[in-house]
């Protein structure tokens, strides 16, 4: 998949019910089973969609989506270089363009990811400003996410990197 020129600028996107999605326009709008008991911190692949978990119930977050022809730098290196707090990545089967939108699919970026060829891809989600303690705590802050998608021939296990300076790191489950 050569780079197709579709790099979403860093934009504000509306989030509802703590979720933003990267999904085909015709995908089912179901939430992951239970975010508060899952070991995923910021992202989960559900079928053809990536569900991004925000700390903001209803409001705006910052997000950017990058479609690449090759894999980016290693996860830990990317986390440190960009000042990100947490990063997760896993495989996704992409068969049609993906749109970045809020849970209801009403607003966002159409065709944020357009694969040259359908098939196995890797998706990496990085977050800043994502407080990970009490899920019911109401905090005023800005969240920022970066989503990177690239093709891959080989399935890989889900991966996670966490900034060791974050005070909540001891309370997080292992990937």
Residue spans for each PLM region:
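Internal, hydrophobic beta-strand segments that form the core of beta-sheet-rich folds
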Residues: 117-131, 143
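Extended, solvent-exposed segments with strong compositional bias
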Residues: 76-117
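Unusually extended, aromatic-enriched hydrophobic runs near protein termini
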Residues: 94-110, 123, 159-175
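Primarily secretory-pathway and cell-envelope proteins
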Residues: 1-80, 132-175
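Short beta-turn/strand-loop junction motif enriched in small, turn-promoting residues
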Residues: 109-110, 130-132
């Amino acid at each position: 998949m050569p780079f197709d020129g579709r790099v979403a600028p860093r934009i504000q996107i509306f989030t509802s019910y703590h979720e933003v999605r990267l999904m085909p326009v015709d995908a089912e709008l179901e939430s992951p089973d239970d975010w508060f008991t899952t070991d995923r911190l910021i992202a989960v692949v559900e079928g053809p969609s990536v569900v991004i978990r925000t700390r903001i119930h209803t409001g705006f977050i910052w997000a950017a989506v990058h479609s690449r022809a090759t894999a980016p730098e290693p996860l830990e290196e990317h986390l440190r270089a960009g000042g990100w707090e947490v990063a997760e990545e896993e495989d996704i089967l992409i068969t049609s363009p993906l749109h970045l939108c809020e849970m209801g699919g009403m607003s966002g970026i159409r065709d944020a990811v357009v694969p040259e060829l359908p098939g196995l891809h890797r998706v990496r989600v990085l977050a800043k400003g994502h407080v990970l303690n009490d899920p019911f705590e109401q905090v005023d802050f800005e969240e920022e996410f970066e989503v990177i998608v690239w093709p891959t021939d080989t399935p890989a296990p889900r991966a996670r990197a966490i900034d060791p300076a974050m005070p909540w790191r001891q309370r997080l489950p292992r990937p």
